[in-house]
From Swiss-Prot:
Lineage of origin: Bacteria, Bacillati, Bacillota, Bacilli, Lactobacillales
Protein name: Shikimate kinase
Primary role: Catalyzes the specific phosphorylation of the 3-hydroxyl group of shikimic acid using ATP as a cosubstrate.
SUPFAM superfamilies: P-loop containing nucleoside triphosphate hydrolases
Record gene name: aroK
Cofactor note: Binds 1 Mg(2+) ion per subunit.
Top EC class of this enzyme: transferase
Alphabetically ordered keywords of this record: Amino-acid biosynthesis, Aromatic amino acid biosynthesis, ATP-binding, Cytoplasm, Kinase, Magnesium, Metal-binding, Nucleotide-binding, Transferase
Main location: cytoplasm
Record organism: Streptococcus pyogenes serotype M12 (strain MGAS2096)
């Protein structure tokens, strides 16, 4: 069965996936290859709705492949109800990586390499509300929750591989 890594932007899903011995499929990388540009550029040119439509199709394709890999999702994969329904069908294999809001905020604030469109458009207070809304979705879909604040990516990867 395919395992799915879920979590808010900046929590370390992609970083952790690099330490897994299992085959990983990074949705953001797959989408960028498909659209021929960065997700940030696509958001700017086409908007969030167009992006979410593509993201949903990629998720569906990866889940239906059912090839014992790990799907590394983007932070917003839980936004669409259709995606949440797909993820519910993957019951017992959804893994949520969690960090405190302050940890995430600081990571995103200092990440000059990967400027995230949804982070840039909010004040810290509004971003906290956005974070809280998303966490409700993540928590409702997750079968295993791993706190990452005080763990190395290698430690998190070991927990995932043992699950």
């Amino acid at each position: 069965m395919t395992k799915v890594l879920l979590g808010f932007m900046g929590v370390g899903k992609t970083t952790v996936s690099k330490h897994l011995s299992m085959h990983c499929k990074d949705m953001d990388a797959i989408i960028e290859a498909k659209i021929g540009m960065s997700i940030a550029a696509f958001f700017e040119q086409h908007g969030e709705i167009a992006f979410r439509t593509i993201e949903s199709q990629v998720l569906k394709d990866l889940l239906f492949a059912n090839d014992n890999s790990v799907i590394v999702t983007g932070g917003g994969v839980v936004v669409l109800q259709e995606n949440r329904q797909l993820l519910r069908k993957n019951h017992q294999h959804n893994i949520l990586l969690v960090a405190s809001f302050e940890t995430l905020y600081q990571r995103l604030k200092h990440d000059k390499k990967s400027q995230r469109p949804l982070f840039l458009k909010y004040s810290k207070e509004a971003f906290y509300e956005f974070y809280q809304q998303r966490m409700v979705f993540y928590e409702g879909l997750s079968d295993l929750v791993i706190r990452v604040d005080h763990r190395t990516p290698e430690e998190v990867a070991n927990i995932i591989e043992g699950y």
